Regions:
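Conserved donor NDP-sugar-binding/catalytic core segment of glycosyltransferases
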Residues: 106-142
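A short, conserved alpha-helix in the catalytic core of glycosyltransferases
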Residues: 156-158, 162-167, 173-201, 208
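Glycine-rich, basic loop-to-helix element that forms the pyrophosphate-binding segment
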Residues: 76-94
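Short aromatic/hydrophobic "clamp" motif used to bind/position activated sugar donors
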Residues: 99
Length: 298
């Protein structure tokens, strides 16, 4: 029987929202069972919160409510792992055929899982990405094949053997942002395709401003800036590193902090190994990492 491990890193999430996401997952697994066949599914939550979200009684009730559609496992990390390290911790001993990574605030439509797993039947495909709504990711993709340059891991499925082959996420470099970009590019560097599946829909609960744009928090600004500099360094873009450091040094406190952290890593010899020196995979197009189909308002 084919096996799938679904995993989410949680941090201070509301219990009710997580239960809603689990209920939607149960439905999408049921649809797979009815339309395709048997699939053994494990759902793993890695809790990086300072205080645990679920009690033992909650875990027991969740498994009862899942009614053998899938097994729920709850891991307490005991520290703020970030997404990259959290997913590595959950995935390091995974023996399933496939791994699915989801943000905890993602709600799947019933056929989402079925449609992504169908794409992964192709041995040349390494990862399948769902379409997020209400904010669909703007990056370009081939409308005939679905092939795209990288995937957001808000909702993706990939082959476990590839996760092991490329040694998972680069948690030493990326805490939150750009870990999925780096992960995707290394999958392609290993010879596999990234496929965007627009018919596989995942509702991602981002909070929008009144003008329809997305307003990041201070922590999001810091980790995003830090990751942008480190990604450019790792993927052989020294001019981009210089430019970003200059721009962020003139920015707000969160951006200035990101530059200081980069300089500290440099002094301590903690920067990542530079790869893709011929720029075969990684592309830096201004502030984007591939062509975009549209822009969000700011």
């Amino acid at each position: 029987m084919m096996e799938l491990q679904i995993q989410s890193v949680i941090y201070g999430n509301k219990k009710e929202a997580l239960l809603k996401a689990i209920s939607a997952l149960k439905q999408t697994v049921q649809v797979y069972h009815k339309k395709v066949g048997e699939l053994k599914v494990s759902l793993v939550y890695g809790d990086a919160s300072p205080n645990r979200i679920f009690l033992e009684e909650d875990v027991r009730r969740i498994n009862e409510n899942l009614n053998n559609e899938m097994e729920f496992q709850y891991r307490i990390f005991g520290f703020n792992s970030g997404t990259a390290k959290g997913h590595n911790l959950m995935g390091e001993n995974c023996t399933a055929d496939f791994m699915m990574i989801m943000n905890p605030d993602v709600i799947l439509e019933p056929q989402c899982l079925t449609r992504m797993l169908m794409v992964l039947k192709d041995p040349k495909v390494g990862l399948a990405e769902a379409r997020q709504t209400p904010l669909e990711h703007a990056k370009e993709y081939d409308i005939k094949t679905g092939e795209t340059e990288w995937a957001s891991t808000a909702c993706t499925v990939f082959k476990t053997k590839i996760f092991k082959e490329i040694k998972g996420f680069d948690a030493d470099t990326f805490f939150m942002y750009c870990d999925d970009l780096d992960f995707s590019w290394r999958i392609r560097l290993a010879g596999y395709k990234i496929i965007y599946v627009p018919s596989a829909i995942a509702y991602h609960a981002k909070k929008l401003a009144v003008d329809g744009g997305w307003k990041p928090t201070g922590a999001e600004v810091y980790y995003s800036a830090e990751a942008a500099i480190l990604l450019a360094y790792k993927w052989a873009q020294p001019d981009r590193v210089k430019y970003l450091c200059e721009v962020f040094s003139r920015g707000g406190e969160s951006e200035k902090k990101a530059v200081k952290e980069f300089e500290k890593r440099k002094q301590e010899g903690r920067l990542p190994e530079v790869i893709d020196k011929t720029h075969k995979i990684g592309r830096f197009l201004g502030d984007e990492y591939c062509e975009m189909r549209f822009k969000f308002s700011k």
